[in-house]
């Protein structure tokens, strides 16, 4: 087709050209058809969920991560082009993007290599979800002071027990910790725990159901979600862009154009008569 990088570079030497593939430009997998779940499988994230069998993230995560990787790479290339006048060819693979994304936390216990390395538990094992009287909550109880505040609030002496006395001890005895904490909060309401723990800076949040997200007071305050009316689909809810520019905080409040939405407008600019 003549639209590869080398062909276009002859016409526009300083072009920034990005190509996205599943597995990269070389190797035994380059001709495979690729979907997000396949990248989750190859990159190891499906094995990182710590269940009896591998499971996928319940979202199409690496399609989106690769898009963000491309946007970041292009932005960097644009800065370099402004400084040097040179373009770039940016080959980006979903696999590399996935590995780069998950490595700092998913693979933190596999980073150091050697015979004498003591591997730590998976990071997210230390972040369980707890059941309260009415809802689920997430609490980060790594810091001694945070764990003590929870125990004091629930009138418990767990923080004085040797097996839970320090962060290392709590991580080491994680299963026992989860059971013990679940027991002392089982009769407490989630709103009460969040409100009181928040007063002392303890990291805590209610686990929203998918039907509750738009009712969360922080989401409402930030106007994180907007509602529009689509000419075909009807009324719909969607997130606003997560960034704000200094001089432009208003974002489009209409749907993406459907096929042919702007035909008349564009054709009229090309002096095509209405009758045609």
Question: PLM ranges: what are they?
Answer:
Residues 65-72, 145-148, 175, 191, ...:
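A structural signal for well-ordered alpha-helical segments within the folded catalytic domains
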Residues 2-137, 142:
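Active-site-adjacent "lid/gating" segments in soluble enzymes
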Residues 3, 156, 219, 272-273:
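Helix N-cap/coil-helix junction residues
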Residues 70-77, 149-153, 180, 212, ...:
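Alpha-helical scaffold segments in soluble metabolic enzymes
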Residues 125-200, 204:
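Aromatic-enriched alpha-helical interface/lid elements that frame and gate functional surfaces
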Residues 199-251:
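A glycine-rich dinucleotide-binding beta-alpha-beta segment and adjacent secondary-structure elements
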Residues 165, 229-275:
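Flexible, small-/acidic-enriched active-site or ligand-binding loops
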């Amino acid at each position: 087709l003549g639209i590869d990088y080398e062909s276009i570079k002859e016409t526009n030497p300083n072009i920034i050209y990005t190509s996205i593939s599943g597995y990269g430009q070389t190797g035994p997998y380059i001709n495979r058809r690729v979907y997000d779940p396949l990248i989750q499988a190859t990159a190891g994230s499906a094995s990182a969920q710590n269940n009896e069998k591998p499971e996928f993230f319940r979202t199409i995560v690496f399609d989106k991560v690769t898009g963000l990787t491309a946007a970041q790479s292009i932005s960097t290339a644009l800065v370099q082009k402004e400084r040097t006048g040179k373009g770039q060819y940016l080959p980006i693979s979903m696999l590399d993007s996935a590995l780069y994304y998950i490595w700092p936390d998913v693979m933190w216990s596999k980073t150091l290599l050697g015979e004498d390395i003591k591997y730590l538990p998976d990071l997210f094992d230390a972040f369980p979800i707890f059941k309260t009287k009415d809802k689920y909550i997430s609490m980060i109880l790594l810091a001694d002071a945070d764990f003590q505040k929870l125990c004091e609030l629930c009138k418990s002496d767990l923080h004085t027990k040797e097996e839970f006395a320090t962060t290392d001890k709590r991580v080491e005895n994680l299963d026992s910790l989860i059971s013990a904490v679940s027991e002392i909060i089982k009769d407490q309401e989630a709103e009460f725990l969040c409100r009181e723990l928040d007063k002392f800076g303890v990291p805590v949040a209610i686990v929203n159901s998918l039907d509750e997200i738009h009712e969360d007071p922080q989401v409402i305050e930030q106007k994180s979600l907007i509602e529009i009316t689509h000419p075909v689909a009807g009324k719909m809810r969607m997130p606003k862009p997560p960034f704000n520019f200094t001089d432009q905080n208003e974002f489009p409040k209409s749907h993406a154009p459907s096929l042919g939405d702007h035909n008349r407008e564009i054709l009229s600019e090309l002096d095509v008569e209405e009758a045609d």
